[in-house]
């Protein structure tokens, strides 16, 4: 028998039959082994047909095992030396199968031919006995085979892949709607109406839904399926079936050339033979362009074009704008066969309606309650803070994650109860240890401990009962809601079937009863809600918390500790940045306005230009602000503008254009802000940058956004922008006023600024703040700050630092220069003071646990051990 004439499944079953014979120590390969191999084939046609005939497959497999077990076995050396030989009956079956394949007008011997041959040849044998026992007849087998195969012919070595192709590679959306498994679709009426109009055309009746990811393209098709089930569609679309095609399943496992095309042709043939009853929905339709394309083979797009043009294939596609442009528009012949339906992102108000429609499904799934305030917050906050995704998807994700968070808290032990149980465990361990001691103190402690343990045990029992009761209440409500949802689904089903008795039973009996029970359960929970251990509601706070986790932007309501921190922000800034009260006040006020929710939503939190001589605290203020807001300086995006002196350096901020090296990496500024949307951005020494760089700043300062080299919008609305400059520092050094900046000096500085920067740039900045030169009082405070840093480093070595007033005076005289600010002071402390201390430590004069005394003698700094 020529193996090339057999399908792959028949060849596989013969190999499996041989292995079964070896496993059971049979010397002969007989029909029963081949029958066993066919029945045990994974996703095989024979077990599929038997299941459709109502045969219990497990029972059938047991009967086969019993029959094979009865066959003669050869054990020991004789079994190893002699191989397994095929019986004459096996060859008879294969010859008969070949004859049957010719009767069926098939090109290959397939598994159904082999099965029919076995039924004929082994009527009185082991296989015949099993078939009779399980009520499997030839006529019954042929009847189901015709249903499965239809008019298909075996023209390839893998024909099973083409039988019931739509069931294998598609999902029936109409059935899912009937089974109440799809989420309700709210709104989108205009898009659904447009899709219905296109589907009702004579030719080119193929809508393609185009929209951004997450705007609800697939939901529109599900909404259409819902309408078809309800009968809320034109006459031409009633009783249509929507099948969602799974391109992944269609391609997966197609090893040989032509196998993919064969499967797709089988799908298209089924759609065609339905005579317009089936609407084929291909999600991510751009995948058909190039799908299955190998050397010389046609891709899926070219295979469906002729049917689309003739109107034989009703197809609904869905894809994004980018993919439509990249794949579909390039293929003009494919593009003209589809009619685009643009799906816009819904507004915040529409999103709220969509979420209200989905609310009940999420409540049932998570077993919790969702407040309406949470729904409104999810729509508003996601729209405001999550810029790179689209409504309603991002808002739905927020609700889902908040529900999951509350659910996981319900399923885990409440914190109060957990603390008590851990304490009981600790005290029991201590009790065990004390019970072995005999002294009076231990006995007294044991009595006190037993009393404390008894109290805790009572408290634990009381709280455990309360916890179990609350949990059972929540579970009961969840089960009742699931039951109510199921009852509503059944009511819809019976309404479609016009079974009015059952509809009345459900609508006026079961459903009101379940609603009453849910209300009762929720009322009893409300009563105990004040001191409840478990929280079972999603509120605005949970949504804010998740937004904060996703973006790093503080959206949550202010807790007491944070209120204090914000109110003390100005004070904290002044502790590090000495003598610049105007600057610290302006920055602190901007942050407070933003955190209270009163800032302009379209602009950054604040944008400032700090002017002043070098070393007066301009950059230090930005660092201190970052440290206070984020507890670290990591959230400061520092860009030294001296690196942007050339015109072409602008591309480094937003990323180079396509075709240039580094295009994929993006820009230094845009990528940093995309990763950390809530940060302080410091543009240091802005006067050093090229004029063209400031053109970028205009849209950042005005609209709080910037478009990078890939066309993506980066959101700057939650950043604080600080620019520093030394422009006008010559005038500022002449300032003699101790309190503020003199008017004529301020005017001179502003005139110089206007000469250097364009008016449209200066006009968009919130505040231009001038820093005064440091006073002698300020220098003393700065010395204390610098010495505190040295002290902290020495503390790590367990060395204490003491500095006399004379030493501080010398540091102020030697280290301070009005032109250079505090930087020379820092250098002086580093070069003189730290060096002297280091020498003493190396020499062993100052060691761990000692006190280093810093004194001033004859205008010099002296370091000694106290």
UniProtKB/Swiss-Prot annotation:
Alphabetical list of PROSITE patterns matching this protein: CLP_R, CLPAB_1, CLPAB_2
Coiled-coil stretches noted in the UniProt entry, renumbered to this chain: 396-530
Region (NBD1) residue spans: 164-345
Pfam families linked: AAA, AAA_2, AAA_lid_9, Clp_N, ClpB_D2-small
Keyword Nucleotide-binding in record: yes
Location of region: Repeat 1: 6-71
Designated name of the protein: Chaperone protein ClpB
Organism whose genome encodes this protein: Clostridium perfringens (strain 13 / Type A)
Encoding gene (name): clpB
């Amino acid at each position: 028998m020529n193996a090339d004439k057999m399908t792959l499944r028949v060849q596989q079953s013969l190999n499996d039959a041989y292995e079964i014979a070896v496993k059971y120590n049979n010397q002969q390969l007989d029909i029963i082994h081949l029958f066993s191999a066919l029945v045990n084939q994974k996703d095989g046609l024979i077990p599929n047909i038997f299941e459709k005939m109502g045969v219990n497959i497990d029972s059938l497999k047991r009967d086969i095992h019993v029959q094979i077990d009865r066959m003669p076995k050869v054990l020991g050396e004789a079994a190893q030396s002699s191989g397994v030989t095929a019986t004459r009956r096996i060859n008879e079956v294969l010859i008969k199968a070949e004859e049957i394949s010719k009767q069926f007008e098939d090109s290959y011997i397939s598994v159904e031919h082999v099965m029919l041959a076995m039924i004929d040849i082994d009527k009185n044998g082991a296989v015949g006995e099993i078939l009779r026992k399980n009520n499997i007849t030839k006529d019954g087998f042929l009847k189901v085979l015709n249903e499965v195969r239809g008019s298909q012919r075996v023209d390839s070595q893998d024909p099973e892949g083409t039988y019931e192709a739509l069931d294998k590679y598609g999902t029936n959306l109409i059935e899912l709607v009937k089974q109440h498994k799809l989420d309700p679709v709210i709104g989108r009426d205009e898009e659904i109406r447009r899709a219905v109009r296109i589907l009702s055309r004579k030719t080119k009746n193929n809508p393609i839904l185009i929209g951004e990811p997450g705007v609800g393209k697939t939901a529109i098709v599900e909404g259409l399926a819902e309408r078809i089930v309800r009968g809320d569609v034109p006459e031409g679309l009633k009783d249509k079936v929507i099948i969602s095609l799974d391109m992944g399943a269609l391609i997966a496992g197609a090893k040989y050339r032509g196998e993919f095309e064969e499967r797709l042709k089988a799908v298209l043939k089924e759609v065609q033979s339905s005579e317009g009853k089936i609407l084929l929905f291909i999600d991510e339709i751009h995948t058909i362009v190039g799908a299955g394309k190998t050397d010389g083979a046609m891709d899926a797009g070219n295979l469906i074009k002729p049917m689309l043009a003739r109107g034989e294939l009703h197809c609904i596609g869905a894809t994004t704008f980018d993919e439509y442009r990249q794949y579909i528009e390039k293929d003009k012949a494919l593009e003209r066969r589809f009619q685009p339906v643009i799906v816009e992102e819904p507004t915040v108000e529409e999103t709220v309606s969509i979420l209200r429609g989905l609310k009940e499904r999420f409540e049932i799934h998570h077993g919790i309650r969702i407040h309406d305030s949470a729904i409104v917050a999810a729509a508003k906050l996601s729209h405001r803070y999550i810029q790179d995704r689209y409504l309603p998807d991002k808002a739905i994700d927020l609700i889902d994650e908040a529900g999951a968070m509350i659910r996981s808290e319900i399923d885990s032990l409440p914190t109060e109860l957990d603390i008590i149980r851990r304490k009981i465990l600790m005290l029991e361990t201590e009790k065990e240890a004390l019970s072995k001691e005999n002294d009076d103190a231990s006995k007294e402690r044991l009595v006190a401990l037993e009393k404390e343990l008894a109290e805790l045990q009572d408290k634990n029992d009381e709280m455990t009962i309360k916890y179990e009761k609350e949990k059972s209440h929540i579970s009961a409500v969840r089960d009742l809601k699931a039951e109510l949802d199921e009852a509503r689904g059944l009511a819809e089903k019976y309404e479609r079937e016009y079974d009015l008795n059952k509809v009345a039973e459900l609508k006026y009996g079961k459903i009101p009863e379940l609603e009453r029970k849910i209300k009762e359960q929720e009322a009893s929970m409300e009563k105990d809600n004040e001191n409840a251990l478990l929280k079972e509601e999603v509120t605005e706070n949970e949504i804010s918390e998740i937004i904060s986790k996703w973006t790093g932007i503080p959206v949550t309501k202010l807790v007491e500790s944070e209120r204090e921190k914000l109110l003390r922000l100005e004070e904290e800034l002044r502790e590090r940045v000495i003598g610049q009260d105007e600057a610290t006040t302006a920055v602190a006020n901007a942050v407070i306005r933003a955190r209270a929710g009163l800032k302009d939503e379209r602009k950054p939190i604040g944008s400032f230009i700090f002017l002043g001589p070098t070393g007066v605290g301009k950059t230090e203020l930005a660092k201190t602000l970052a440290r206070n807001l984020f507890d670290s300086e990591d959230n400061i995006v520092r860009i030294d503008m001296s690196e942007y002196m050339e015109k072409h350096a602008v591309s480094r901020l937003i990323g180079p254009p396509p075709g240039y090296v580094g295009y994929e990496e993006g820009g230094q500024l845009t990528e940093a802000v995309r990763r950390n949307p809530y940060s302080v951005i410091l543009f240091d020494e802005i006067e050093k940058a090229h004029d063209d760089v400031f053109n970028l700043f205009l849209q950042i300062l005005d609209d709080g956004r910037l478009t990078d080299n890939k066309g993506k919008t980066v959101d700057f609305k939650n950043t604080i922008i600080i620019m520093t400059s030394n422009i006008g520092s010559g005038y500022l050094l002449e300032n003699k006023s101790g309190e503020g900046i003199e008017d004529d000096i301020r005017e001179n500085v502003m005139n110089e600024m206007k000469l250097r920067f364009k008016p449209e740039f200066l006009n968009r900045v919130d505040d231009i703040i001038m820093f005064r030169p440091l006073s002698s009082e300020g220098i003393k405070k700065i010395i204390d700050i610098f010495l505190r840093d040295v002290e902290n480093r020495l503390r790590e070595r367990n060395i204490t630092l003491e500095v006399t007033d004379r030493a501080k005076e010398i540091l102020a005289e030697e280290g301070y220069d009005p032109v250079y600010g505090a930087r020379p002071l820092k250098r002086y402390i580093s070069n003189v003071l730290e060096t002297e201390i280091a020498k003493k430590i190396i020499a062993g004069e100052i060691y761990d646990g000692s006190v280093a005394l810093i004194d001033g003698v004859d205008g010099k700094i002296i370091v000694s051990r106290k």
